[in-house]
């Protein structure tokens, strides 16, 4: 199979980018660029970022742990070469990362990894410095409902949601590094096989998943096993920060967050206020006076809590069932004695990452780019330069099934990205044997005629009694509501006219606009790997990534 790609013209539509800040930033709006420069677009700025990163080295302790963590993954001479490069002065890193979604989670996980690999290649070619792609495993996060499932399109149409049965998922606060898959992964795998086993390349990919996703495995371990297999040829390096051997290396960053909590919350609050004044939504809320670290008081693998200032020299544990508090001295003692009790927040994680690694660039999605707009004061206070922020590649896959269904209903892919009833109404009025008026035209004609007549007689009625002006306005409002109600019923009736068209529309929306969101944010890899081939699909995604772009493209097998 060969892929073609074409750039989409709706790159900045609300369907393509979900963050208002990211939309403005990708468009090059001056207000957005004042918070986060688009240095990734400029060769000279890229060279400066690489040179700055090259002046920093990876510590021997981190290199040892990286070697051990990656040694348990799928064999990869390319990864071994990249690990050796990280030990050499002058090597830089391009970093990306993601939560550990079931069966790799949404497609954008793959796109992030591919974007980091292609960006690293491009920076190395452009600057002559060794550049290594690193995938930061976000194992400190505790948001299970975001990662305990995977959605695939059924080959015959309709979505199939595969999920782990984790009774405490909604309330769990423990880092997912410690979460085992459990027995419910087996029926999820069985359902996946039943849905996809007829696809031409199913056995290869399903066997890979079944080897990795075992009940005794952790979410993070299974995720890493699969993703490392996909990018073994490219040498993608993996870093899991939730490692007891790395906790002492993280302690200085947490100490900084604790000691500078007041100052950091002040400068970050000022930044948030400036973003709000500029019309942007603040991605990460900063609590007044709170440090950017989480603390696990009960066990190293137990729930983690934010800290709020309580009385003098003490912190309350936000959300703790016993409303517990801890003194400043006890907190610092815990950091010295058991640093693994501390984990990073969304704003502190980048600083930890760039303290450990010679990061020249971070490749992120729209949400991450939005919170990167908040980070400059944090990095300035820490005395560290920010890396380049680079948007990941974005794709929409149009396989042969989707193209066939589009042809049957005579639609272009972008025409599917509208509400279901509106699309069905359009098809009904377009394809009806008799001429049918659209709901919008009907409403305009009915109410327009009434409003015109009402306006014509309004003067005459008011001349008889000026108090009737209120009655005229009420009548106009009543008729508008009645016409809108009639139009709504007409629209729904049109949408119900053709059951076949409705079925085709539902299939297409499942493939191209599932849950009214971009395909890459909802659908997972299993369907596409089973239909197209694991390596074939991965390789074509790599080939379609354009460095320093962030464009949205259609992939057409």
Swiss-Prot record:
It comes from the Bacteria. GO terms for molecular function: ligase activity. Its EC number is 6.-.-.-. Coiled coil: none annotated. Keywords: Ligase. The keyword DNA repair does not apply. NCBIfam families: thiol_BshC. Belongs to the BshC family. HAMAP family: BshC. This is Putative cysteine ligase BshC.
